[in-house]
């Protein structure tokens, strides 16, 4: 796996990788991470992958981090942990 770029964002760490014919977009926030795989056949360049990271996509991903935290918290509560 080859790291192509760190993409600055104020709320999450975003890293772009190339691996096995795919671009991997990795978003990290606290203890959570999301990885999106984009086939190199679906885009023409790394710039196209960066274009996918528009305001709507990032807003949805950040909301998903909140949902992930809520899900984990609820699981801890259900099991009295």
Task: Name these PLM-found stretches.
Residues 42-81:
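Mixed-charge, Lys/Arg-enriched low-complexity segments
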Residues 2-27:
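Amphipathic, interaction-prone secondary-structure segments
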Residues 3-6, 31, 35-37, 56:
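Residue-level preference for alpha-helix termini and adjacent loops
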Residues 19-45:
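A short, structured beta-strand/loop element
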